[in-house]
């Protein structure tokens, strides 16, 4: 789920018409999750005619949702459990629950747009493909919801056999539970990425000799791992065009993660090098890579995650208004580790949302992170 703030009058009919066109081209967005007796997998069923059914588009009443001029925690409190936050997973199976909601929240001469799509039917790439189609200047495209079985078949070979199963291990589950129960209060920070600091860091990284080129994402990933003192770092990657038969027109969940340990993110070039071999995406601090922790060592490992949405996102072009700020919404009570979201805060600026129990303001000194995205939404940054 994301929220985007605008100034100017909300173009309600333009958004409604645009959403109707997007759903007509992608009727699976109006679908329902079902599972029959004895079935092992959940299915998405939908009307190919793609009607804009109830619950897909919401216009809030004035004052119904207070999201302007309040903190990130207050925004999350308003969103949590509301009709604007769609429910995926088992809670939505064999119900009439929508898997997508687009909502306009008016507030005088300004307004906010929330877009929520269930992670059951969409990963970050799919989300932003749909989100970007709401723009008046964007092309409305049809994406295929048909599951490509080549993903499961090729996953272990691409990211490692043990790595492809880590999410399902008892140790990983207990690590997340322990963090949520005993980790302490989660604090939200959000900073812009400083372009000048990034360029200086890229120049320095070239001297390391790991790679002739490092991206901004490489820098941010290595920086986040060090800031959080991670022993296990997860970086989701989009596997479209990296696994056979899966391309840009495929909707659904086609991402997995590269997992790193302490020796694998000492330098930004190591992140770049881990993605450099087509068809094989693996940490490279040692050759061969050190096996991932397991059992009690995995339970106790300091676990962090960083995911990059900025490469998928574009600003929204809507008639009669101007976009001011965009950022992800994540339930602070559901944070399983030290999390960072890289996203497109404005048309030209990249932001990083940090959800952390451990991070201190002093830790950010000397990093590539600059000013806070917004001092009201993220006070004390």
Summary of predicted features, one role per range:
Residues 130-138, 234-240:
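Amphipathic alpha-helical scaffolding segments
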Residues 1-40, 181, 186-381:
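Acyl-CoA-dependent O-acyltransferases
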Residues 108-110, 139, 209-210:
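Short, solvent-exposed loop/turn segments that connect beta-strands within catalytic domains
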Residues 39, 136, 146-148, 237:
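Short, intrinsically disordered/low-complexity patches at protein termini
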Residues 116-117, 130, 219, 223-224:
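Short, hydrophobic/aromatic alpha-helical segments in well-folded domains
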């Amino acid at each position: 789920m994301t929220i985007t703030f605008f100034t100017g009058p909300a173009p309600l009919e333009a958004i409604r018409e645009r959403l109707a066109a997007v759903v007509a081209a992608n009727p699976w967005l109006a679908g329902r999750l079902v599972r029959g007796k004895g079935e092992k997998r959940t299915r998405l069923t939908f009307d190919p005619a793609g009607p804009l059914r109830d619950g897909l588009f919401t216009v809030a009443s004035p004052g119904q949702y207070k999201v302007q001029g309040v903190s990130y925690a207050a925004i999350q409190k308003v969103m949590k459990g509301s009709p604007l936050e769609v429910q995926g997973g088992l809670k939505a199976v064999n119900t009439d629950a929508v898997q997508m909601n687009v909502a306009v929240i008016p507030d005088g001469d300004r307004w906010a747009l929330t877009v929520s799509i269930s992670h059951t039917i969409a990963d970050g790439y799919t989300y932003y493909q749909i989100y970007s189609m709401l723009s008046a200047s964007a092309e409305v495209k049809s994406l295929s919801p048909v599951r490509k079985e080549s993903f499961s078949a090729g996953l272990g070979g691409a990211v490692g056999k043990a790595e492809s199963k880590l999410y399902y291990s008892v140790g990983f589950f207990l690590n997340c539970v322990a963090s949520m129960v005993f980790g302490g209060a989660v604090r939200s920070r959000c900073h812009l990425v400083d372009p000048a600091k990034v360029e200086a860091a890229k120049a320095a990284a070239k001297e390391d000799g790991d790679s002739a080129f490092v991206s901004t994402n490489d820098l941010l990933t290595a920086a986040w791992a060090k800031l959080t003192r991670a022993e296990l770092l997860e970086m989701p990657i989009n596997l479209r065009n990296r696994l056979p038969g899966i391309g840009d027109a495929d909707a659904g969940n086609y991402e997995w993660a590269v997992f790193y340990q302490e020796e694998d993110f000492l330098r930004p070039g190591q992140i770049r090098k881990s993605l450099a071999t087509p068809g094989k995406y693996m940490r490279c601090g040692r050759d061969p890579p050190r096996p991932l922790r397991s059992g009690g060592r995995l339970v106790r490992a300091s676990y962090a995650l960083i995911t990059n949405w900025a490469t998928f996102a574009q600003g929204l072009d809507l008639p009669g208004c101007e976009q001011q700020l965009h950022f992800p919404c994540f339930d602070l009570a559901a944070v399983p580790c030290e999390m960072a979201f890289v996203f497109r805060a404005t048309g030209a600026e990249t932001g990083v949302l940090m959800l952390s129990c451990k991070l201190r303001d002093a830790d950010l000194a000397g990093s590539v992170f600059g000013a806070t995205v917004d001092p009201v939404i993220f006070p004390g940054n």
